[in-house]
Amino acid sequence: MAKRIVEPFRIKMVENIRIPSREEREVALKEAGYNPFLLPSSAVYIDLLTDSGTTRYDHHGSMITGDEAYAGSRNYYDLKDKVKEMFDYDYVIPAHQGRGAENMLFPVLLKVKQEQGGAKKPVFISNFHFDTTAAHVELNHCKAINIVTEKAYDSDTYDDWKGNFDIQKLKDNIAPEWCRKRCCHYFSITCNSAGGQPVSMANLKEVYEIAKHHNIFVVMDSARFCENAYFIKERDPKYKNATIKEIILDMYKYADALTMSAKKDPLLNIGGLVCIKNDEKIFTLARQRCVPMEGFVTYGGLAGRDMAAMVQGLEEGAGEEYLHYRIGQVKYLGDRLREGGISIQYPTGGHAVFVDCKKLVPHIPGDQFPAQAVINALYLESGVRAVEIGSFLLGRDPETGKQKHADMEFMRLTIARRVYTNDHMDYIADALIGLKDKFATLKGLDFEYEPPVLRHFTARLKPIK
């Protein structure tokens, strides 16, 4: 039976929300081109679009200490000290968010690989690149290759580490001419596109050792690093008695750099980081890109108060009691749905419940976006906005223009941090379970407008008659 986890906080301020009428929702969805990204937030009752930047703060005290100096803000040096404490990395560049961090680092990795005499057909290899990460790889004329464990594709079967790299695939074609193509191994922790699934410490270590043997740089996408550390504590007996911060330090031994959207686990509404362990050349080249792309090197597109909040958020996000509640709330929603006969990626991950829409609407083919059809039905039924992680998000192959094949067609129910109560989780579960009899009647979708890059953000769709 689904178990509620009590919230480890008191509510000090509230925001009133309302459920738009069915008629209002129908009009809003049509005007949005059947793409919930284009809905105004006023047309949404419970917003499960993303956990990025949607956290509720308790950082306001630290924000008052913001030093808004253009150069040399003391908040930058506080942030640098916190990064050293948590990750043991020497070099820090702030960014306005995660994609800003990627935009500074990825071209540098390509440049360095080219200087080494390789990268004629450069690739980034990941357990699973998320959408903006893959876009930055492809905008740099590189290929994004995903090799998550095959266990991730079996949504009904429990496995502790569905975010792991497939080690055998990583070792395939490891000959020198293939290694010269690899700009980096890129860990996504937790692995968002596979269902917010964790990566084991053993997998981190093995991937890193393979990379170092072949002179390949390793980067950690660190949006949800605290959640990954919590899963390691819960599931790896070696770390049962370790603190979350001790586990984090061990995790980051197995990378050379990190990019971070601080809008997730560090509990911010804005912010990102590039951190380099000890490679001064990579740091210098990335910092050169900071000034024209993000801002001066000690603020990187952020106000001093945002860096002050990041220092606090990095600490709070690693709190074990908070993580127990956070991941427990997601599990509660997942358990409610499974008890109601809704297929999900099992076990639930750290930040969202991923509903397996291939099983809910098997009559809708991938190129008609089955998860998007379920998302729109849920919105019309309840005012709940979710997001698609499947064919619609994956987009087209930049070389052939053909739709990329999606092994998973997920509706992601993403839980904002410290925003919704367990009663909201029950409302979501009841609404989706109540749709079960309507799934067979849902129709697929086609494009009215398709942008060339990251199409799912601004595309307009129409129901197929």
From Swiss-Prot:
<comment type="pathway">
    <text>Amino-acid degradation; L-tryptophan degradation via pyruvate pathway; indole and pyruvate from L-tryptophan: step 1/1.</text>
</comment>
<dbReference type="InterPro" id="IPR011166">
    <property type="entry name" value="Beta-eliminating_lyase"/>
</dbReference>
<dbReference type="InterPro" id="IPR015422">
    <property type="entry name" value="PyrdxlP-dep_Trfase_small"/>
</dbReference>
<dbReference type="InterPro" id="IPR018176">
    <property type="entry name" value="Tryptophanase_CS"/>
</dbReference>
<comment type="similarity">
    <text>Belongs to the beta-eliminating lyase family.</text>
</comment>
<keyword id="KW-0823">Tryptophan catabolism</keyword>
<comment type="subunit">
    <text>Homotetramer.</text>
</comment>
<keyword id="KW-0663">Pyridoxal phosphate</keyword>
<protein>
    <recommendedName>
        <fullName>Tryptophanase</fullName>
        <ecNumber>4.1.99.1</ecNumber>
    </recommendedName>
</protein>
<dbReference type="InterPro" id="IPR013440">
    <property type="entry name" value="TNase"/>
</dbReference>
<keyword id="KW-0456">Lyase</keyword>
<dbReference type="GO" id="GO:0009034">
    <property type="term" value="F:tryptophanase activity"/>
</dbReference>
<dbReference type="InterPro" id="IPR015421">
    <property type="entry name" value="PyrdxlP-dep_Trfase_major"/>
</dbReference>
<dbReference type="InterPro" id="IPR015424">
    <property type="entry name" value="PyrdxlP-dep_Trfase"/>
</dbReference>
<dbReference type="InterPro" id="IPR001597">
    <property type="entry name" value="ArAA_b-elim_lyase/Thr_aldolase"/>
</dbReference>
<dbReference type="Pfam" id="PF01212">
    <property type="entry name" value="Beta_elim_lyase"/>
</dbReference>
<feature type="modified residue" description="N6-(pyridoxal phosphate)lysine">
    <location>
        <position position="264"/>
    </location>
</feature>
